[in-house]
């Protein structure tokens, strides 16, 4: 999957269910072909709907959207896990189904005109639209879909995990592809298969402009071809990518695309320095900015264009409101020094969130208290009902405080409270086998000082980490910060070569297979997985399976809350913070839909240029 073009890109795994809208029956089969998939009640839109409600069907086409992104890139290959992919590649490609920001975990046919599967969901068959075409005019075929699936699993450890229960894809008709699953009744699987990004088999097996065969297992800076609404018009390696809307796009009149893809050109510029990136926005060379810094939002947007109304500022409900999130400092438990849960708990006592929130964030953050923060999946209080029953099944494998103690982070915010917290941290460190000798926290058995290096990819993050580092030093820990470029950071985190890093996990309102990639034992040793903490816990594995195979919503919520409690009780991470709003700023040449969708901002798909047609 290609990540969304907003800066806070995240890979959200949407789940599937049996609550589906039926379409026409196949002439050769009694199976029902469905035009959409949803897990939260019935689909909002009936078969044959015209367009999503939030789009402007009369939005003018044209104009240029200039965007910025952090880091760099060295490949345009959309499936390759190695290297740094360019931002925006999703503009070039289509998926079998298209999700909507109006609904939770709902998708409608894009390349596929329908999907069919039996009641036990042992397989799912997708039927391609007859008029789906690649940019070179050739039809999108079932062979392309099979090729895309196989290469996605081969080339991306993350996608291999995501599709781990999809064992096979095969051509099953002139326009049909059947995916076989290794377990029945996993309601998520048809949905996640529908998210599969489809690439052209014939193009990747063809010859490039240099006369050499293309190789999808390698990086490339040749403009890739897709079936989507845009093509790559210009590339400056590592610096910029420009996409241009295709006038001959086959799917421009498909209902899920009506009112979308309005900009003629979308150009991304890559910045290594966040301050330079912000200056580019201030100068008017970048049109849109999602602001991640609370302090900059409060103090940095007083330039003339804002005062004169030429730059608009908006505070909108956070795009994460449809999901649960965990953002945290992540100790790498593959390293022996972080394997004791009491030591990890001690690290939480050294983090003074309240002081950081007051001095750096102007009080705009909330402390994260759940791995599903902000959603109904978050645990609270003590377990009861079905949640308690699930935990009792694993009573001998989970910390006893799961049943007796509500999870709470330490609270500081003033010197006295922080001193108390640091004393508690020292006590926990002693229980973990460490002791203070002078001003050094050492392993009581070896005498070796505990050291911790925080690995980050942006100097702008140092302001957040420095107060934490200073507190760790107060209790004798040799804490340091190492800032590396985006490429080094990616390579080191993929290979788990770090002490502590920062990670944000985002979970859809209907969690599924991604949970195994986040917390599962199998993912702990697979390079490129999202299990950065290195969690290997049979109880966690069992709870992940209960989440994935929950037969109904009530069971899913209970299982997710039980999972949340066990993850929290093991102190796998040091939770950071969460903001209830997202901050966006944009030049008044951009126009957004009057009514934004419930679970997003519709950017950039449904926005348009005020200069279009001029």
Curated annotation (Swiss-Prot):
Keywords: Peptide transport, Periplasm, Protein transport, Signal, Transport. One of its GO terms (molecular function) is peptide transmembrane transporter activity. It is found in: Periplasm. Residues 1-27 form the signal peptide. Disruption phenotype: Deletion of the gene does not affect sensitivity to ampicillin. Mutant does not accumulate peptidoglycans fragments in the extracellular milieu. Deletion of the yejABEF operon leads to the accumulation of anhydromuramyl tri-, tetra- and pentapeptides in large quantities in the extracellular milieu. The yejABEF mutant, but not the single yejA mutant, displays cell swelling and lysis as well as a severe growth defect. Pfam families: SBP_bac_5. One of its GO terms (cellular component) is ATP-binding cassette (ABC) transporter complex. SUPFAM superfamilies: Periplasmic binding protein-like II. Gene3D superfamilies: Dipeptide-binding Protein, Domain 3 (3.10.105.10), Periplasmic binding protein-like II (3.40.190.10). The keyword Transport applies. Disulfide bonds: none annotated. GO terms for biological process: microcin transport; peptide transport; protein transport. Belongs to the bacterial solute-binding protein 5 family. YejA is part of the yejABEF operon, but it has been shown that YepA (Atu1774), instead of YejA, is the binding protein involved in peptidoglycan recycling in A.tumefaciens with YejB, YejE and YejF. The complex is composed of one ATP-binding protein (YejF), two transmembrane proteins (YejB and YejE) and a solute-binding protein (YejA). Probably part of the ABC transporter complex YejABEF, which is likely involved in broad-spectrum peptide import. This is Probable peptide-binding protein YejA. The lineage of its organism: Bacteria, Pseudomonadati, Pseudomonadota, Alphaproteobacteria, Hyphomicrobiales.
């Amino acid at each position: 999957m290609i990540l969304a073009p907003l800066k806070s890109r995240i890979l959200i795994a949407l789940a599937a269910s049996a609550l589906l809208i039926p379409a026409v029956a196949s002439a050769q089969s009694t199976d029902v072909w469905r035009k959409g998939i949803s897990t939260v009640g019935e689909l909002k839109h009936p078969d044959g709907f015209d367009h999503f409600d939030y789009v402007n069907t009369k939005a003018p086409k044209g104009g240029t959207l200039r965007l910025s992104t952090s880091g760099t890139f060295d490949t345009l290959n959309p499936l390759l896990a190695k290297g740094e992919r360019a931002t925006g590649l999703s503009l070039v490609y289509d998926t079998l189904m298209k999700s909507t920001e109006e609904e939770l975990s709902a998708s409608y046919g894009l390349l596929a005109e329908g999907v069919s599967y039996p009641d036990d969901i042992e397989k799912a068959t997708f039927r391609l639209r007859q008029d789906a075409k690649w940019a070179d005019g050739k039809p999108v075929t079932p062979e392309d879909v099979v090729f895309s699936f196989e290469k996605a699993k081969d080339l991306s450890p993350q996608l291999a995990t995501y599709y781990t229960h999809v064992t096979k894809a095969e051509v099953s008709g002139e326009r049909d592809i059947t995916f076989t699953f290794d377990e029945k009744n996993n309601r998520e699987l048809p949905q996640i298969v529908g998210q599969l990004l489809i690439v052209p088999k014939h193009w990747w097996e063809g010859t490039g402009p240099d006369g050499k065969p293309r190789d999808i297992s390698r990086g490339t800076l040749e403009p890739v071809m897709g079936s989507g609404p845009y093509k790559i018009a210009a590339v400056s390696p590592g610096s910029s990518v420009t996409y241009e809307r295709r006038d001959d796009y086959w799917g421009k009149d498909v209902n899920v695309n009506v009112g979308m893809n309005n900009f003629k050109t979308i150009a991304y510029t890559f910045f290594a320095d966040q301050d330079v990136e912000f200056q580019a926005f201030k100068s008017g060379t970048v049109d849109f900015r999602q602001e991640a810094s609370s302090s900059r939002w409060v103090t940095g947007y007083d330039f003339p264009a804002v005062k004169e109304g030429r730059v608009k500022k908006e505070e909108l409900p956070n795009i994460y409101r449809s999901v649960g999130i965990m953002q945290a400092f992540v100790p790498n438990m593959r390293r022996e020094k972080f394997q004791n849960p009491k030591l990890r708990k001690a690290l939480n006592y050294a983090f003074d969130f309240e002081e950081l929130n007051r001095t750096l964030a102007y009080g705009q953050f909330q402390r994260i208290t759940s791995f599903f923060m902000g959603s109904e999946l978050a645990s609270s209080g003590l377990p009861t009902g079905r949640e308690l029953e699930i935990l009792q099944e694993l009573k001998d494998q989970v910390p006893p405080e799961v049943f007796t103690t509500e999870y709470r982070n330490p609270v500081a915010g003033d010197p006295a409270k922080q001193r108390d917290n640091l004393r508690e941290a020292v006590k926990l460190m002693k229980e973990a086998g460490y002791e203070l000798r002078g001003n050094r926290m050492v392993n009581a058995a070896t005498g070796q000082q505990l050291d911790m290096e925080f690995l980050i990819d942006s100097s702008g993050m140092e302001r957040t980490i420095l107060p934490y580092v200073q507190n760790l030093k107060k209790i004798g820990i040799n804490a340091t910060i190492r800032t590396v470029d985006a490429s080094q950071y990616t390579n080191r985190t993929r290979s788990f070569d770090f002490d502590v890093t920062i990670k944000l996990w985002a979970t859809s309102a209907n969690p599924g297979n991604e949970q195994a990639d986040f917390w599962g034992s199998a993912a702990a040793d697979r390079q490129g997985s999202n299990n950065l903490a290195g969690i290997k816990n049979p109880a966690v594995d069992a709870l992940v399976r209960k989440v994935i195979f929950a037969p109904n919503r009530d069971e899913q919520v209970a299982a997710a809350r039980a999972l949340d409690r066990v993850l929290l009780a093991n102190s796998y991470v040091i939770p950071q913070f969460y903001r209830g709003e997202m901050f966006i700023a944009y030049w008044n040449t951009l126009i957004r839909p009057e009514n934004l969708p419930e679970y997003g901002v519709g950017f950039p798909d449904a926005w348009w240029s005020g200069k279009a047609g001029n």
